Amino acid sequence: MGSKHKKNASKSLRAFSFIILSASIALVYIFNPVKLIFPSSIIRFHHGLPPQSQEIVTEQPKSHSKFQLKHIYHHGSGKNYKIHRRLDITPEYLAKHDAYFQHFNQLQSGTEQVSLDNLDSVVAQYDWPKHHQGKNPWTIELPMKIAKRPAVRLKQRHDHNYIDSYLQYALSVKSNPQHINNVQLEWISEDISVPDVKDRDTVVSLATISSNAYVRFPKDDDEKKNSDWIDVGEPWVPDDRNNNIEFGWGDDGLRGHIFVSEDNKTVVIGVKGTSGAGLPGSGSEETQANDKTNDNLLFSCCCARISYMWTTVCDCYEKTYTCNQDCLEKELVRKDRYYQAVLDLYRNVTEIYPSESHDIWVTGHSLGGALASLLGRTYGLPVVAYEAPGEMLATQRLHLPQPPGLPKHAENIWHFGNTADPIFMGVCNGASSSCNLAGYALETACHTGRQCVYDVVTDKGWHVNLLNHRIHTVIDDIIMTYNDTAPCADQPPCRDCFNWRFTSRDDSLDDEPPLPNPLRPGKPSTTSSSQHHTSTTTTTETSRPQKCLKRTWYGWCVEWGDEEDA
């Protein structure tokens, strides 16, 4: 009897041990399942996000590299939109302007008294973050961590003519899926090099590149004679009437600063943001007029039509809360607008650094960040933008290509911002807002890609203020004060300009695109008469498009003319 009890006890002990062992294995699988199944990679889930926002990230070995400024591009806009030039930052160039750089470092180190009446001193003081105080923005080396992530991009993205033809066709058919599918876009999935946005040094370095685009450039009399700039667009020769035009940092245009890695394999394009009076920390007033025009075109509901007292940037407004969608889309793709300028800038960069053999990233602050996002979506480039206004509306109006069913976390577009910045949060509008008083109609709030937001209102008790939009504030007082980078999540459901009605020519037409078709000749305008059972056909001549050439101070048009007379 005793031995029988011992056997039963032994069986019970073995059964209990088996249960404990099984439970232990189960717990290991529950809390660390992927390491046991996939020892070569780690899949991480971002907890705390809604299911549709959870991102599965496959981490792979990361590399480090240092980046340095190699080129500056300037693309003209407005009446000078055909001008495009490049400045190479060579040792000879740095030696030539050594005195200016030493003076700049003295300003940053605080050894020289800065007068609030001296605009140059104030701009220099605010253009460069304190984190890099004493460092030369033209020779600084910026460390970054490079990661690998999957991406879905157009196979023909290296063919600029193909991209142009697609954008024109997509605009003509309003991105109608039935017709876009006929193009048979070919998407390819591949692992690409991207900036590691979870590494604080990398986020700071990219923000520094965005800040670098604001730094003033040394100019002298030789500079006005185009001694250092290389024409990559339409040549320009000074004459007696135009011998004082300043290029590179002139009154019209878009700037891009090109940083290149040590191994010459990775290129970062830093797009300059808004320069203008009334926006603190946005640089000098060098490109104020065109920056404001493009800001109001990209981020307003209808050409910056806020009230009858505003001068609109285009003639698409029809009546109260009604706007012509076709007109808006044509304005965005005009050759003298910034979207075309940033496309041309990218194409000239790829002449030196071909996209087939180089990894190209884009970054920018404010307007520069939004343009970086539009460029990245057009060509499938990784983008890190800082404090950019909502660019989703512009993306839709431009009908940019997007892989079907691709989740936002796979787009490789990251928007960094803070909750105390009214421009990034989309609340810098209304009659009493600072943006409105400065002449900016920033009415959009929706972003594409992922949003990485520092909640400084909750964490630090900050108040919403336009001063928190400055790039050096973002670097010195936000990113550098947090141990980790901001968590990234999808944009919640968002719609801009919901109270506006947008009209289009295809509202009353069939869905067939009005493209040349040899099998279906165009229909002439006809007038029929029932008398004598005869009909006559007359072709009416379409009138040339006209636009407003001159307005009164309260917005009433007093002079109309042809498009080319503007």
UniProtKB/Swiss-Prot annotation:
Record's subcellular location: Endosome, Multivesicular body membrane; Prevacuolar compartment membrane
Pfam families: Lipase_3
Region listing for Disordered, in residue ranges: 507-545
Cytoplasmic domain ranges by topology: 1-17
Taxonomic classification: Eukaryota, Fungi, Dikarya, Ascomycota, Saccharomycotina
Organism: Meyerozyma guilliermondii (strain ATCC 6260 / CBS 566 / DSM 6381 / JCM 1539 / NBRC 10279 / NRRL Y-324) (Yeast)
Keyword Hydrolase tagged: yes
GO molecular function: phospholipase activity; triacylglycerol lipase activity
Active site annotation, chain numbering: 366
Name the UniProt record assigns to this protein: Putative lipase ATG15
Keywords: Autophagy, Endosome, Glycoprotein, Hydrolase, Lipid degradation, Lipid metabolism, Membrane, Signal-anchor, Transmembrane, Transmembrane helix
Disulphide bond pairs: none
Residue ranges annotated as Lumenal topological domain: 39-566
Subunit structure: Binds to both phosphatidylinositol (PI) and phosphatidylinositol 3,5-bisphosphate (PIP2).
